[in-house]
Amino acid sequence: MAELVHDPVNRVRYAFQRDGENLIVDCAVDSGGSLPAHRHPRQVERWSVLDGQIRFRLGNTERLIGSADGEMVVTSDTDHGLANVSGREAHLRCRVEPALRLQAFLEESAAAARERLFTARGLPRGLAGARWAATFLERYATRQSFLNRRNSCSAP
């Protein structure tokens, strides 16, 4: 398995594997860990739960999914998020089509989480956090994400 990238704020560990222009992301989500609601303007995600129970939010709908439930497809520009409700570590796989800069986005945000540059609610922590957030948004946010904020964040 590839080297794991740890995000202590969301309580997730990622392993990345390129598949042509796509990206496979294996996620180990701690009990109670989550990925907050967000959207990808130009990417499709295909999520599979390998082990555990996940509360998956897709648009305005929430449902519990496990390994027997098959693949959850998230079309581009659709709000989505998830939380591990297993009471133990859960394992998921996500195929991202196309990869674009998602791996760099997740690696950089996980590094900032390890440096405690933002809070569990995603707010910058102090001046260093504000500087990091400004440069991070400059690199990764799209103009559309600012126009369509609707309480979510766009990720590449």
What are these regions (language model features)?
Residues 108-156:
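Acidic/histidine-enriched, glycine/proline-rich intrinsically disordered or flexible terminal extensions
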Residues 28-32, 59, 85, 95-97:
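Solvent-exposed residues in well-ordered beta-strands and their adjoining turns
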Residues 18-21, 46, 53, 59-79:
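Short acidic-glycine-tyrosine-enriched beta hairpin
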Residues 24-28, 46, 55, 91-93:
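Beta-strand secondary-structure signal
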Residues 76-105:
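Ligand-binding loop in jelly-roll beta-barrel domains
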Residues 3-37, 43:
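A short glycine-rich, His/Asp/Glu-containing loop-to-beta-strand
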